[in-house]
Amino acid sequence: MLKVGSSLLAADGGGLSPRFALGLAQFVSANLAAGREVVIVSSGAVAAGRAILPKAAEAGAAIAARQALAALGQAQLIALWQRFFERPVAQVLLTHDDLRNRRRYLNARATLGELLRLGALPVINENDTVSVDELKLGDNDNLAAIVAALVDADALFIATDIDGLYSADPRSNPLARPLDEVAELSAEVLAMAGGSGSSVGTGGMRTKLEAAAKAGAAGIETYLFNGRSAEVVRGLAQDRLCGTRIHAARTRIAARKYWLRHAPVEPGTILIDAGAALALTDKGASLLPGGVAGAEGDFRRGDMVEIHLRDSVGSRCLARGVSQYSALDVRRIARRHSREIEPILGYSYGENVVHRDDLVVL
């Protein structure tokens, strides 16, 4: 799995440039020649769109303008990658809804698997033309990590515009030293992450470490490297360690539990009491309506939500899971016995608000 950021593809005067993409394509080709399957997650659609329609670019960060720029630039982005390969390049656009909904998640996995079987090169991007929240808050680093787990990748390579992870921000601290390997993403390591390296993209070093943590939970190592360095890219193509290697977690979680833990959540929360919290964390129980204190947001049945304990200390997230009931229904059956669900609602989807098989404790 290779993730390429906007800063490596955007031309100085606008649009896309093959300057660094060529070396990355050669890295991909070397892996393909070695018999490995490769999936690319590539940013750059918005940057490409700015050159096509400067008038839209003048609108700045307005969501509608960025969506229009993404629509204009996505074809250019795919064309950039296709020029480097004889094999067909397949465009795959995903949203958080595709990753949050279990059926769509599995459909995406099946599609990517078939593309790889057919010998195509999937190039994935978020569908920024419709993903309002992703344009404001999202990034392709975390998308790459989730997709890496989706396709059961062996490694995640994140190409950036610096040499990897440093002990401090090298742009402001002359004593910063590069880290060749990171055995564990501790709080100390996360604190080393600075801000975004470029105004072109939306992800900084912090999001790359978050992505590495997500990939690591699935047993996938992450490599952060400087995609602007021809020497580094050539070294990687020859299986030499260049940049920062971030080890995978010692214990790999099951595929479904991984999805429950890392899939995007619907903006909504189920609030529980201390008794329910104990049942979830210590006994591995399902969440029953009697332990529910309320619900926030407007989630639907089947949505992924966070489960919070709210007490005198405050509110904190204890678990995530797929709700069997909508937010409105959860509020109506809160504090009630399971046998009261059908008399109250007029229907029942089962005695659990969240079944233990659809729940992961954080």
From Swiss-Prot:
Keywords: Amino-acid biosynthesis, ATP-binding, Cytoplasm, Kinase, Nucleotide-binding, Proline biosynthesis, Transferase. It comes from Xanthomonas campestris pv. campestris (strain ATCC 33913 / DSM 3586 / NCPPB 528 / LMG 568 / P 25). It is an enzyme of class 2 (transferase). Belongs to the glutamate 5-kinase family. HAMAP family: ProB (MF_00456). Substrate binds at residues 43, 128, 140. GO terms for molecular function: ATP binding; glutamate 5-kinase activity; RNA binding. GO terms for cellular component: cytosol. It is found in: Cytoplasm. It catalyses: L-glutamate + ATP = L-glutamyl 5-phosphate + ADP. Its EC number is 2.7.2.11. Catalyzes the transfer of a phosphate group to glutamate to form L-glutamate 5-phosphate. InterPro entries: AceGlu_kinase-like_sf (IPR036393), Asp/Glu/Uridylate_kinase (IPR001048), G5K_ProB (IPR041739), Glu/AcGlu_kinase (IPR001057), Glu_5kinase (IPR011529), Glu_5kinase/COase_Synthase (IPR005715), Glutamate_5-kinase_CS (IPR019797), PUA (IPR002478). Residues 267-348 form the PUA domain. Pathway: Amino-acid biosynthesis; L-proline biosynthesis; L-glutamate 5-semialdehyde from L-glutamate: step 1/2. This is Glutamate 5-kinase. GO terms for biological process: L-proline biosynthetic process; proline biosynthetic process. Its main location: cytoplasm. ATP binds at residues 3, 160-161, 202-208.
